[in-house]
Each structure stands twice: as C-alpha cells, then as structure tokens.
Curated annotation (Swiss-Prot):
Assembly information from the UniProt record: Homodimer. The tRNA molecule binds across the dimer.
Residues binding L-serine, per UniProt: 235-237, 289, 389
Amino acids binding ATP: 266-268, 353-356
Name listed for the protein in its UniProt record: Serine--tRNA ligase
Any GO CC annotation of this UniProt entry: cytoplasm
Stated role: Catalyzes the attachment of serine to tRNA(Ser). Is also able to aminoacylate tRNA(Sec) with serine, to form the misacylated tRNA L-seryl-tRNA(Sec), which will be further converted into selenocysteinyl-tRNA(Sec).
GO biological process: selenocysteine biosynthetic process; seryl-tRNA aminoacylation
Pathway in which this enzyme or protein is active: Aminoacyl-tRNA biosynthesis; selenocysteinyl-tRNA(Sec) biosynthesis; L-seryl-tRNA(Sec) from L-serine and tRNA(Sec): step 1/1
Coiled coil: none
Domain notes: Consists of two distinct domains, a catalytic core and a N-terminal extension that is involved in tRNA binding.
A GO MF label: ATP binding
EC number, UniProt record: 6.1.1.11
Protein family (similarity comment): Belongs to the class-II aminoacyl-tRNA synthetase family. Type-1 seryl-tRNA synthetase subfamily.
C-alpha cells in the first residue's frame, strides 16, 4: 500500500505516475469525493463526541444540584444515536478508501526503465558462456523420462495437468539442489533457516499483497463451518515476511534475513497454453526463498546484496545466466524495483526466469504495520521488505539436466551437488 499522505496531498501527481509508469488508471474524482466525505464525517463525529462529553458533565452538575435531568438524558440519547450513525458512515467511507488503496500498485523507483512489457527490460549483465553441444540436445522432459525419474503421466493421473512425479536419482537431485541452496544461504550469506506453514489466513495474504487483487491466482481451501478460510502459499515470501506483521523491531537488530524451502502452489490463471509441458510452469513447485527486513535507508543496497546471493547459486552450479532490470510494465504489483535472473535453457535456446529479486520499499510494511524504532526514539518508522528466489528448485533442475547432459543421455552431477548425492557423479544411463 502506498503512503496515504501521497494520495491526500499529491493526488494528481501520483495518478499521473501510475498512469504513465504502471498503466493504472486511478479514479481521482471518486477518491477526492470520498476524501471530502471523510473530512466532513471526521469533523461531525469529533464535534458530536465533544458535545456529548460536555453534556455528560452538565448532567452531572445538574444532578448534583438536584435538578430534573430527564430532558438532558433524552438529549444525550439522541446525540448518542447521531454519533453512532456518523461513526458508521465514517467507517464505511474509510473502508471504501482502503479498498481503493489496496488496489493501487507500488510506485516504481526513479531508476526503473519505462516500458510496456518484458521486451523493454534492461539487460544488466551476462555470466558464463552457453555450452556448445556436438550432439542433438534433448530437453529435460526426455532426459528425465529416459532416466526413469520424471513421470508426467503419473502426475496427471494423481492431480491433473501441470503436476509431475519425480523418482530415483532425479528426485534425489531435486532434494540435493534445495539442500545446497539452504546451506549456502545460511552458512555463507547469513540467513536464518525458517520453517513456516504452507496454509495461511487471509490477513497474511493481505499483508504481502496477494489479496485482494490476486485471489484467482491462489488455491483456496474449503472452509468448514466455524473455521476461517485458508489458502495454500504461492511463495514462502508470504508467511516469512508476515512474521514481522504488527511488530516494532529494534533498529539495532536490522537487517533480519530469513530463508525457507517450501512447496509453492499457483493456479497459473492467465497462463493457459504457456509452458504446458515439463517443469517450467507447474501448479506445485519447490522454491528456496530469501527475505530481508531492513532499515528503510538501506533497502536499495540490500537489493543488490540479495540479488547477488541468488546469482551465487547459479555461479556455483556453473549455469550461464543473465541479469535484467524489469521495466515498469513488467514489474510485480508491490515492487518498486526488481531484478530477474534468467538461466540458459539449451533445448529452448534461450534464457528463462529462475529468480525474481524485489525491493518492496514500505509497500508491504504499511499493510502489515511492520515498524522499527531506534533506541531512545519515540517515533517508529516503517521497515522496508525485500524478497527473492534463491532459487526456484524445479527450474534449476531443468537447467542442470539440460546443461549437464551427455551424448549417451546421462547427466553429469555438478561438483557442488555431489556431497548431497553420496558422491554420485553421473545419473541416468
């Protein structure tokens, strides 16, 4: 949620930025009308409350003098009814303003390039050289099925499209990748390993910005009578970031760096027909997520650091990748600046996203009321939150299978994974 003071004091400027940079049309007339109603109702309720307090004292004085206070009590009742009605009207207007505010995307940082979609993202760097093969390249589907490690038919039987079953050495490599990532982030990058629920309530989803705008992208549970509704997490960012919801953090304890390995569940609404085969776009996939809660003056530095941590995974696996700065038209709803890391996928002869690292500024913190305070200070400040994939495990498996394939259909195990696979150096044939 962007700063409501910006909407009150710089509405026209904010609306223009949202239109140009986010292709978001803010209804300024409606918001202005609601804000006028809010001000009037605020004054009305405050005046009624003040008058009610004054009348209450007058009744006490009249009673002490032995006067008949019945007429005064009747007036108090009438004033109480007026106050209740005014408060209800004010609450309704505030709720409507809040709903509009929750639908507004974050404002991009000044250095984010203007653009309409991913074709206008800015490439920052490339690392590694894509391998030249002297044999016909197989895709990860063929490699996995020939190794008896990927079974998409079984996934479809058990659940439907966009599900897979992994077995044997492929399943072991998938697990090894996640363990390697966790060990790297906790032992070298300073993150605290965190285990979180895979089901979360709606307040948690509002906190990180999935609700109310992206409800159709989630898998929702059927709430039993008397129970609150839940949704399966689309990313560990949701529960991990919300650990600081409604918390005032000692600034001396910042940054807080957490990592979690979880399954992620996405309906992939709007992705019909895209990546229908293989592990690239699944309803259920594993990811190692990194989250940082930082001093609001240091979040841009933190974004560079966090992105570097994701890059380190790719570098140690010796997987060629490129780093791109997303343009305004390709950024996520709550981000003010995002880098994507795209890994080389030989069978597609292109780079595919494997990590997205974002600075959310105070957008999520305002929703969550996550604040910090320096020792001796009376005022609190909203923290800044960042998140990034470190990495998507399934897509990393795709990249390893395809980049490390051999002419006989076997796959060489990257050196950094061998300790996690009992010293195994080749899988498959």
């Amino acid at each position: 949620m962007i700063d409501p003071n910006l909407l009150r004091n710089n509405l026209a400027e904010v609306a223009e930025k949202l239109k140009v940079k986010r292709n978001f049309m803010l209804d300024t007339e409606k918001l202005t009308a609601l804000e006028d109603q809010r001000k009037n109702l605020q004054v009305t309720t405050e005046n009624l409350q003040a008058e009610r307090n004054a009348r209450s004292k007058a009744i006490g004085a009249a009673k002490a003098r032995g006067e008949d206070i019945a007429p005064l009590l009747a007036e108090m009742d009438d004033m109480g009814n007026q106050l209740t009605e005014a408060k209800a009207q004010l609450d309704a207007v505030l709720a409507e303003i809040n709903q509009i505010a929750l639908s507004i995307p974050n404002l991009p940082a000044d250095e984010v390039p203007l653009g309409k979609d991913d074709t206008e993202n800015k490439e920052i760097l490339r690392w590694g050289t894509p391998r030249t093969f002297d044999f016909e390249v197989k895709d990860h589907i063929t490699l996995g099925e020939e190794a008896n490690g990927l079974d998409f038919a079984a996934g479809a039987k058990l659940a439907g499209a966009r599900f897979a079953v992994m077995k044997g050495q492929i399943a072991k490599m998938h697990r090894a990748l996640a363990q390697f990532m966790l060990d790297l982030h906790t032992e070298q990058h300073g993150y605290l390993e965190t285990y979180v629920p895979y089901l979360v309530n709606h307040a948690t989803l509002y906190g990180t910005g999935q609700l109310p705008k992206f409800g159709e992208d989630l898998f929702h549970t059927l709430a039993l009578q008397g129970e609150q509704p839940y949704a399966l997490i689309p990313t560990a960012e949701v529960p991990v970031t919300n650990l600081v919801r409604d918390v005032i953090i000692d600034e001396a304890k910042l940054p807080i760096k957490m990592t979690a390995h979880t399954p992620c569940f996405r309906s992939e609404a709007g992705s019909y027909g895209r990546d229908t085969r293989g592990l690239i776009r699944m309803h259920q996939f594993d990811k190692v997520e990194m989250v940082q809660i930082v001093d609001p003056d240091k979040s841009m530095e933190a974004l560079e650091e966090l992105t570097g941590h994701a890059e380190k995974v790719l570098q140690l696996l010796n997987l060629p990748y490129r780093k791109v700065l997303l343009c305004t038209g390709d950024m996520g709803f709550g981000s003010c600046k995002t880098y994507d890391l795209e890994v080389w996928v030989p069978a597609q002869n292109t780079y595919r996203e494997i990590s997205s690292c974002s600075n959310m500024w105070d957008f999520q913190a305002r929703r969550m009321q996550a604040r910090c305070k320096a020792k001796g200070d009376k005022k609190t400040r909203l923290v800044h939150t960042l998140n990034g994939s470190g990495l998507a495990v399934g897509r990393t498996l795709v990249a390893v299978l395809e980049n490390y394939q051999n002419a006989d259909g076997s796959i060489t195990v990257p050196e950094v994974l061998r300790p996690y696979m009992g010293g195994l150096d080749v899988i498959g044939k």
